[in-house]
């Protein structure tokens, strides 16, 4: 057989195998049922509809993009966001289904830039067993017992430090004061840093730069907010590592400071985490522990002047607590006092519902999922929009109206059209499922104690009615929420 014959037979064999392979692929594609994707559009190449989705809007609304898409496509629609095909959910049932099936059908999937700045060991971006282990560390240190015996005192101490510094008839940015309160609390709680000290103030300054980068476009070149934040990240980690080395040295020498009953000490003693893991854990807890709580407190300060009846009822509730403490010769709040703040808890819930500090979550489908006749393909991004449920007029009467009384009678929502009328099914300000925020109870405690001392000691008014809360999508006050305060005493 000649060389040309051999070449001919080889090429024929290869071509035959290739044709058979193509035939099998075509048959498989034909056999596979067509996906029934939710309605929607994918927008521009690569960008999709991301620019419209992230366009700033009033925080007490869903914004033009969501309103238009829900009106056109319904509460579940497809889009292309953050460079990926996505399913967006404004549906209470689907949102709950997504969160309850974390690790089974869905998993956390934040943009890569978030992991780049918070760190690969940050609880926000971790999944699976490592996230569970990191979360358990946080839960152990934020336990119910610790809230009662230790953290309540610390929360009240830092509240008083901030509020007592306000001058009569002065005007200032309330959001900055709320951030000062929550940062000082977390800095002491995590690393025993004292407010007002040079090292604490330096760390706070770096954290301001860091935070601007977390919420900015991930453009990593000199001068951008993201680039500056990465620089600040390095400075913050160097500071934390220095504190770690000091603690480890003292532990080895047996010279521990018993007053340093903080997270850093706990992690060094009770975990097997690497240095890198501890650094990312502390960095992310400082971020999570002070940023969202401070915005929630600022929102309460913003909403309450528009509801004078709520302020009157709060004053009556807190006057009663203060009078009882005075008669008993006590000065510090107790856990029993906190539990008596029933209407305050309603105000906290309503602030979280209407303000929606965390507006949506990032998830991706681990498998092909079918829900209400729609297919969610494996690998697609899934965005449960928490704010859309909290502002749904079918679930909450007059949802854009600040109404704390809706949370009375055990928080039942009379307009919830489901099998259960309990608001726990639809009210998810801290997420849900296995990734429920570990600091949710601390955040509510901070808000209640801050409101307690604010109501007892000050009248306040907003000095700029145009300084509204905006969603970028992170919630912020463009001018810092300027208020004027006048002192008074209710006891």
Curated annotation (Swiss-Prot):
Residues annotated as transmembrane: 6-26
Topology of the protein relative to the lipid bilayer: Single-pass membrane protein
Single GO biological process annotation from the record: cholesterol metabolic process
Result when mutating residue 112 to K: Mimicking CYP90B50, increased cholesterol 16S,22S-dihydroxylase activity and production of furostanol-type steroid
Catalytic activity of the protein: cholesterol + reduced [NADPH--hemoprotein reductase] + O2 = (22S)-22-hydroxycholesterol + oxidized [NADPH--hemoprotein reductase] + H2O + H(+)
Residues given in the record as heme binding sites: 437
Disulfide bonds: none
Phenotypic consequence of residue 288 to G: Mimicking CYP90B50, increased cholesterol 16S,22S-dihydroxylase activity and production of furostanol-type steroid
Enzyme class: oxidoreductase
Keywords: Brassinosteroid biosynthesis, Cholesterol metabolism, Heme, Iron, Lipid biosynthesis, Lipid metabolism, Membrane, Metal-binding, Monooxygenase, Oxidoreductase, Steroid biosynthesis, Steroid metabolism, Sterol metabolism, Transmembrane, Transmembrane helix
GO cellular component terms given for this protein: membrane
Impact when changing residue 209 to S: Mimicking CYP90B50, increased cholesterol 16S,22S-dihydroxylase activity and production of furostanol-type steroid
InterPro entries per record: Cyt_P450 (IPR001128), Cyt_P450_CS (IPR017972), Cyt_P450_E_grp-I (IPR002401), Cyt_P450_sf (IPR036396)
Pathway linked to the protein: Steroid metabolism; cholesterol metabolism
E.C. no: 1.14.14.-
Listed result of changing residue 151 to F: Mimicking CYP90B50, increased cholesterol 16S,22S-dihydroxylase activity and production of furostanol-type steroid
Lineage top rank: taxon: Eukaryota
Function: Canonical brassinosteroid (BR)-biosynthetic enzyme capable of converting cholesterol to 22S-hydroxycholesterol via sterol-C22 hydroxylation.
Protein name, per record: Cholesterol 22-monohydroxylase CYP90B51
Name of the gene: CYP90B51
